[in-house]
């Protein structure tokens, strides 16, 4: 059960990182197409912050899982 939960969480976090990276690419490639975000720079910064948040969670979970594997 632990492995299923850990794998699921790692996949979820990796997916969220990819999701927010894709949003940044969309903003960079066609900023005029995003009408609800008049401040493109702020929108990009917000997406980068979300990406960093999920990336950090992914890294921390990986460290926890590596530590638990070493402990037995």
Task: Give the residues covered by each predicted segment.
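Extended, charge-rich alpha-helical interface modules
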Residues: 1-72
């Amino acid at each position: 059960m632990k492995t299923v939960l850990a794998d699921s969480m790692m996949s979820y976090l990796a997916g969220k990182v990819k999701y927010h990276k894709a949003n940044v690419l969309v903003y960079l490639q066609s900023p005029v197409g995003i009408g609800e975000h008049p401040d493109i720079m702020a929108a990009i910064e917000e997406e980068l912050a979300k990406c960093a948040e999920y990336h950090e969670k992914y890294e921390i979970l990986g460290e926890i899982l590596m530590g638990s594997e070493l402990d037995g």
